[in-house]
Amino acid sequence: LPFPVILTGPRSAEAYLQQLHEFVGATLGHAAQRHYRIVIDDPAEVAKQMAQGLKEVKQFRRERNDAFHFNWMLKIDESFQRPFEPTHENMASLQLSRSLPPHELAANLRRAFSGIVAGNVKDNGIRMIEQYGPYEIHGDPAVMLPLDRLLQAFVKQHRMKLPGGAAYVPCYRVVQTEAA
């Protein structure tokens, strides 16, 4: 299914977008990187690529007699549609291994990031961290090393908390386990 995705931003966002790209490659592989493009500081090029992508989507749907207002051909397993409750138990039991199919690893990484956001900014998540300590995120080194690098970069770039105030205290701990 054609679906144009472009990660873009000003020149100042280039290092950030490159870090995301490297993380996707290190954890999900080159095949996952082929599902998006990165365009830096060029709104006209983004518009051009999105217009071309939209043409491809329309052509694809016309050829298959599919609607334009709803993607009837897209099938998403129910397990990927359920909300993730970021409890300490759920965070610790996430499977983060390169041995998983890429779509399952991607879903579990999304859950891990969702938990980190909850622990950083959501009232219930903050209270759970205060009561039980940081979440533990377990996984094999092939996933955990790139995840730890990315999260450390986010901390350095002040992406984990609002500017000002006290220094960021992580609401998580990255724990490497043996590869499955």
Residues covered by each model-derived region:
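Sequence-level detector for tyrosine residue identity
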Residues: 16, 21-23, 36, 80, ...
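Short, acidic/small-residue loops that bind anionic groups at enzyme active sites
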Residues: 1-18, 32
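C-terminal non-catalytic accessory extensions
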Residues: 112-180
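Charged, amphipathic alpha-helical linkers/stalks
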Residues: 23, 27-111
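Generic marker of "main functional regions" within proteins
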Residues: 15-18, 30, 34, 47-50, ...
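Electropositive phosphate-/nucleotide-binding environments in soluble metabolic enzymes
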Residues: 14, 40-44, 141
